[in-house]
């Protein structure tokens, strides 16, 4: 195996590749603002273990999405990633019509700008959801739970 092949194989095994839950963790930190948080509390609020949150922050730091302290998001890098990279790294997966939590243009603030028919709703499948619509797989399984507990994160 050549040098490039070894580098690619090494990168594939690296523990530093972003995972979907890493984006959830960074977004939760962003909406926390100046509020102090602990790994345990953050994990409980978004449905992850303390260990998962810790590993997510290490990967986010390695990717440049949080600062060296792993306490503050790098807003510029995060915005660039969300706008230009997320759809390629974690493409949306559509599913059947179901009951769930509104997402995309079906949720504020986009629902105020994008006019759509009541039957043209996108939802994350969620048993406690109150909207019926086309299902969209959430970035991570605990996203609907986390969004239902934190309206700011849901936006």
What does each of the following model-derived ranges do?
Residues 53-54:
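Helix-turn-helix DNA-binding helix
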Residues 15-22, 38, 68-100:
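Short, cationic-aromatic polyanion-contact patches
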Residues 2-32:
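Short alpha-helical segments that sit at the start of domains
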Residues 28-33, 60, 146:
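Generic structural signal for hydrophobic core residues of well-folded globular domains
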Residues 48, 59-72:
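A short, conserved structural fragment
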Residues 40, 57, 66, 135-140:
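Non-transmembrane "mature" sequence context
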Residues 34-46:
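Short acidic, hydrophobic short linear motifs in intrinsically disordered regions
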Residues 1-6, 96-155:
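Long, low-complexity, charge-rich intrinsically disordered regions
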